[in-house]
Amino acid sequence: MNQNHTLDNERNDDDEHSNNHVDTNDMKNFISCIKSKSNINDDKEDQQRPVRYLSRTVINSMTRGQLLELVKSMYSDRSDIYHMNSIQLLTLINKTIGHNGNYVQVVTKDYINDLNVTQLRIFCKELQLDTTHDVDRMNKPMLEILLKSYFKNNYPTSTNDDNDNENRSDDDDDDDDYRNDREEVEDSDINKNVNISSYNNEDIEEVDERTKSLKIDRRLLKMHQDNAKLVDKIDMLKNTIEDLQNRLLTAETTRDDILRRYSILENRENIRDDDDNRNSTTISNLQNLLNNANIAMTRSRINVADLTASLNERTKQLEDCLTRGREKDASIDKLNLKVTELEKLLQIQRDTHQDATLKISNIRMNDNNATRIQISSLNDELHRCQDQIKSTSITVYNRIYSDLYERLWS
């Protein structure tokens, strides 16, 4: 059953690899399976083979290779089973084999040797053997012995030496066959009601010769049968080896393809990592630029606020200056009006002076004393008027400029 174990490993076989020497056990199980398959058409051995019990949970946990070997032990003449998957094989088993409660009866040989450690532990726990034994710490041979002992004690078989027959070597099998042949010959003579004691010596010798010849013929027939079985086994082994080689080649091809795909994926992952690193670097740089821009914007906002406050203050100051300027302009306009009035007064005085000058010139023309006296008086009056105009203008100008000075510097 385990010839496909290494290739059809569809379920949990890790415990078996960790607790057993896989190559040795697999080879033993493979040989036992070949033996069981070679004897499947032997009616006599089928009658002597005991009824075994398998848990349905254990059967459901079997790999496709184990299920295929179980079905082949029941239907050696069917070729369609090699194309069935695990579900189809399980369906065929459940339809054909008998059952006893939760344990399926199967007519096969060394089925316990074909279970892995996990399946054996599940089987022991379902039989509640874990209450008396630490099955989790037992290896595969100990679990096999425990299960065989349990079924031998709780499910008696048709013969008492079944376990001995299972573990018997090929030489012991030949001795058993020879002993069975001898018993069959003796039984055949007894069943024919032959009275050997009534024969004479010649008859006895003839019977002995016939018995010896029959034994030799049976041994030769047995040898031919064994040779035929060996040839079948060799052919089966060749086919199995060829199938294993094909599967190994397929597995190597699949492995190379997987390695190639893994290399491609790894290269893609490396490229993706490089892109991610570049993207992360770019994102980091952009984040730094954004942070710097945020800092600059914050500073600009502070500066704008300061400038706005300063501008508002300067605007207020300018408005105050404009107000004061308007007031000063109004004062200057008033002063200009006063200056204009003074200029008018001066013009009037100049006109008066010219009139007086004309009068004086007219008086000079008369050239008389009265005129001269009048002229002198007029000159005196003129000088007095000039002095008065000068003092008045100086006073007015001083007052105007002092007022302007006070207003401009106030």
Swiss-Prot record:
The keyword Thylakoid does not apply. Residues 161-188 have a biased composition (Acidic residues). It is found in: Virion. Keywords: Virion. Residues 1-24, 156-197 are annotated as: Disordered. One of its GO terms (cellular component) is virion component. Its main location: virion. This is Structural protein ORF142. It comes from Trichoplusia ni ascovirus 2c (TnAV-2c).
